[in-house]
């Protein structure tokens, strides 16, 4: 948890938080942003760093309540805590000493431009700062800007303070008055930044803008912050947020900013209506409760089945003529039901179904299914153990080769791997190996069969970057080999692409969580909200943090674009988003 040690209200919907986050503060630089999540049910909100104090271990953000979540955030009092404060994210601003530099902040953009002003002053640049607000009543930080500015000017839309008009009116005056301006930095609403960039274009002055206002997810995976810069597609949260304003396609960007406008408005209206209803009931307008996730439909409660099951009757010798020609069908949700939910479609085998399908395996002396499996599971072995109802041994065989049997049993493409090489499949339907793997893994849940390795610890430490399937498999193998393993995940939940890339009707989140919990029981440690490369670097891991090796498995998060017209339009998504 991250405590809010200072809260200040600047206007009706603008407020400041100073948050205790020592590691984030230590790694912060101008231009960085953080992702904030207030609680388990909250959404991720990107906030540009407005200030940081490495000595105090605090980071300051200035927030404007626009949607439901930011309105909820505005209700949090000083002294309360937020669940996640992830950062620093983005690429730090590249600043160097200039003869003269102009820093322009409009509205909320005043906050993120401040760290850049301070650093330029420390570098020895001659600083000219311009801040703009709708009126004097909404002004903030004019004292902080005056402290670090060689020249300080203010514009208000209504003329209640400083120059009447937009910041571009003042910027135009400054450009005409001063020679030797090496750079203009403009942060604020998109129309303001576009106007500043157009104003400086004829002067040939480098103009940097910050596109933090279009970010949603903060990792580049949602694609909401895509922006065309010159002839290239960029992601504001990964490649930015700072870009050359003369190269940014602002018209395209302003359309993209409206992408979720209707959804945000509807969500806020529902939130306000619910808050009003609760207030009328005398509950003080508390935040509406969020329902807990529903239980997935099932056809048999595997947890209710006994661990020790009587062995089956003696079976006859099997061959192609004696086994069932078709695989045992797996029950599924009725289409009329599943069209109205996101719960798992395939519901899994019952014990009788699993035994019937296991009986179709010929227990080949030279099985071709094993080399067809990428991790070399002893497939006849685990099916044989299942067939004699020794589920614990069947699970042991699976786990000895595969860290994630419940996941792989659901999403591994067995039809082109182990099942494609199944000898039964030469004449009949191949054995449903994946379905049997899933059954055994599901049966093992909650039975305590995942135990810490018995071998002696090696004394070695390994850091695993990312928590997707490659990382989890690596962590599982290393912990079994006696290595001390820590997994570092940038998001607030572990699972990587398993969580955010595969829908729950195909791979339920609770299945992923069970596999991760099994690894934790083996001794794997998970550090969430940790961005390796920003919060900690790999050289840091290998030196001061004492790791002997680092496995980097960050996945293929960035798509490749074709460079055709319309690629950045709303509604056009890449396969990675």
Identify what each model region corresponds to.
Residues 107-110, 191, 221, 403, ...:
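Residue-level detector of alpha-helix initiation sites
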Residues 136-143, 484-487, 491-528:
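Rossmann-like dinucleotide-binding cores of NAD(P)H-dependent redox enzymes
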Residues 461-465, 513-564:
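Feature captures the FAD/FMN-dependent oxidoreductase FAD-binding
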Residues 241, 249-461, 509, 552-576:
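Ferredoxin-type iron-sulfur electron-transfer modules and their immediate structural context
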Residues 1-80:
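Ferredoxin-reductase
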Residues 462-486:
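N-terminal Rossmann-like FAD-binding beta1-loop-alpha1 element of flavoenzymes
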Residues 68-216:
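FNR/FR-type flavoprotein reductase catalytic core
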